Amino acid sequence: MENRDLKMAEKIAACVADKGGRTFLVGGYVRDLLMGKHSKDIDIEIHGVQPKELENILDGLGSRTEMGASFGVYGLRGYDIDIAMPRQEEATGRGHKDFKIYVDPFLGTYKAAMRRDFTINAMMQDVLTGEIIDHFGGQEDLKKGVLRHVNPHTFAEDPLRVLRAAQFAARFSFSIAPETIELSQTMDLTTLAHERVMSELEKALLKAAHPSIFFEQMHKMNQLDDWFLHLTQLIGVKQPEKYHPEGDVWNHTMQVLDSAALL
């Protein structure tokens, strides 16, 4: 976290504590911290104060921006921090916007973390004390290099999480838990918006040392056909063994992809 943003997060946390609440770093920041990586994902979650109280705190610290006030997400102008309140989501349709959102300042850390996609992204860190809150074994999965979904019901509500599993597997060279692969095989990706798919693909191609893992995991989850049919069609296409000891055109393409990532 940038020092300036960290100091602001601490100021927010101190004001929240004065009102009887707690402030946690959540999501990618905590994961990256434990992996020894620098993170630009600066997300904090405010527990134990009402939305109006939080708004008053933010107004006293700077120029508040409403990134989604109706579902408890704010910002401060000039700072790269996302400020959210605990919330629950209920799917009302198949699209990524088809959700009812319920803000609940007193939801508790367990239920708040349950809406996260993977255990490694469900950890929290108290901004003031540094305490790590890990309800779902994220630290252990991080040590083992495993991507495991937190909750099968919330995971299945957003099919983008299948692509996120493949993307994280490629970026971190992690494996995907068998139960997560099995769940992902049942999910329908055809409803996803093109730009959401391309965003995950871009991360895999530009941030992973071995982007082939993204496509290999998508194939393992039986999810290549809907978005990457042209790659599926390469599987089993033979090449002259004399010139291509790596095997079929699929293997050749994956090797070329990984070589390109080194450039």
Describe the function of each predicted region.
Residues 1-263:
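Catalytic cores of the polymerase beta-like nucleotidyltransferase superfamily
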